[in-house]
């Protein structure tokens, strides 16, 4: 093969994907899919109705403003001004993107240079590392560590950063830190005190913060989501990322947004105008109208920002009980719609799994899909090479699923438990 057909160096070693691999394995209709994080519950009726109405309007089927449909950026500005306690310029401080992925890509390409160091908290959403390496940056990893409290169920809040270890990762080469709260896959919701430690270090070392907050509405009782961009000295150095897919359970719409100061957002705009240019007009208009419906009733229990976490809290508690009933010790998430559990306690014989070089959780999930018809995601996929051992006994289950899907998963898990008893 011609050397000219060889891949560009910037994507060297980035060709494997946990999502492609395990989505393919779970494609069999007989497999109960608690793997990839997409809802199989119905989105709100009014969201679908808005899209249906808008699709019939001719001019809304054409290109729109490249940095965000005017009605959408206005709605986003109105929504988030309530939390930032200051005006957000819809045209200069908000950028609508092709999903949160697009926001991450624009931020990294627009702000991170070759040779820059970027701090990544482990576990992390897998594309963080890939996007940073494509930009020529050096990811610097720091792990969350579990410090369980005796006599208490292990929760995502038990996973914390060591402040001294975190501080040791900052230096003159540090360009940014990647923050994810509520966290995927742990479900950790960073406290105000934890975020203040990060903010203080960002200010001390003049470091940017790329804050992935796509699960911002999915926070369970006893916890509160804080935006690090609202901390003193942080607005001017923070890009905050949101997602329509996570907000309204419409992951297929692939709409996201970045919010930040004009002097940062303009660089993300440059990337967008020279790559995807714009996002789908009808989807943006439908999202805008859906947002206005809920903006006007944010204190109402029927507001989707309030009703979805209540619905998911029930599903979360059901999954916790189910996993505990078969002897597992799940990490109870404080936010998001994933739950992880240590599956090594099941003592499954994985001798017949071919690739002995794969981490334990990869082999376990492949075995579970094949033999139990139940899909999950290995948590070591969210780790760098050096920390995979720390997390390879955990798998991630998604619980934003219909009751019938969770019923099927429960049947599989309980039958499995009976076989082992």
List each model region and its residues.
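Glycine-rich loop-to-alpha-helix module at the N-terminal edge of alpha/beta enzyme cores
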Residues: 34, 57-63, 75-78
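PLP-dependent class I/II
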Residues: 1-30, 36-54, 81, 86-421
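Short beta-strand to alpha-helix junction loop
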Residues: 67-68
């Amino acid at each position: 093969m011609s050397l000219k057909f060889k891949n560009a160096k910037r994507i060297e070693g980035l060709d494997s994907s946990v999502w492609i691999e395990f989505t393919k394995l779970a494609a069999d209709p007989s497999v109960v899919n608690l793997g990839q994080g997409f809802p199989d519950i119905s989105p709100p009726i009014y969201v679908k109705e808005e899209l249906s109405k808008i699709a019939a309007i001719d001019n809304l089927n054409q290109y729109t403003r490249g940095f965000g449909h005017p009605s959408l950026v206005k709605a986003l500005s109105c929504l988030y001004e309530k939390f930032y306690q200051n005006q957000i310029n819809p045209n200069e401080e908000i950028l609508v993107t092709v999903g949160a992925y697009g926001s991450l890509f624009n931020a990294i390409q627009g702000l991170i240079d070759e040779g820059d160091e970027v701090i990544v908290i482990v576990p992390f959403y897998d594309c963080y590392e890939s996007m940073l390496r494509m930009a020529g940056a050096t990811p610097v990893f720091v792990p969350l560590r579990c410090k369980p409290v005796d006599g208490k169920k292990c929760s995502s809040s038990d996973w914390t950063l060591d402040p001294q270890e975190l501080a040791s990762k900052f230096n003159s080469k540090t360009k940014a830190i990647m923050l994810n709260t509520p966290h995927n896959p742990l479900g950790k919701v960073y406290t105000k005190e934890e975020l203040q430690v990060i903010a203080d270090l960002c200010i001390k070392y003049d470091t940017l913060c790329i804050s992935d907050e796509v699960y911002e509405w999915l926070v369970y009782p006893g916890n509160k989501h804080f935006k690090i961009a609202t901390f003193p000295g942080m607005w001017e150095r923070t890009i905050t990322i949101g997602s329509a897919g996570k907000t309204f359970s419409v992951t297929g719409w692939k709409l996201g947004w970045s919010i930040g100061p004009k002097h940062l957002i303009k660089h993300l705009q440059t990337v967008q105008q020279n790559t995807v240019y714009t996002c789908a007009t009808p989807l943006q208009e439908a999202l805008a109208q859906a947002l206005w419906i809920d903006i006007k009733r944010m204190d109402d229990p029927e507001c989707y920002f309030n009703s979805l976490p209540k619905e998911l809290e029930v599903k979360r508690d059901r999954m916790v009980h189910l996993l505990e009933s078969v002897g597992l010790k799940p990490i109870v998430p404080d936010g998001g719609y994933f739950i992880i559990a240590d599956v090594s306690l099941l003592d499954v014989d994985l001798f017949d799994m071919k690739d002995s070089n794969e981490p334990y959780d990869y082999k376990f999930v492949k075995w579970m899909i094949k033999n139990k018809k139940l899909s999950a995601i290995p948590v070591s996929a969210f780790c760098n090479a050096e920390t995979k051992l720390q997390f390879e006994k955990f798998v991630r289950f998604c619980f934003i699923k219909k009751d019938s899907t969770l019923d099927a998963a429960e049947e599989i898990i309980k039958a499995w438990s009976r076989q082992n008893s």
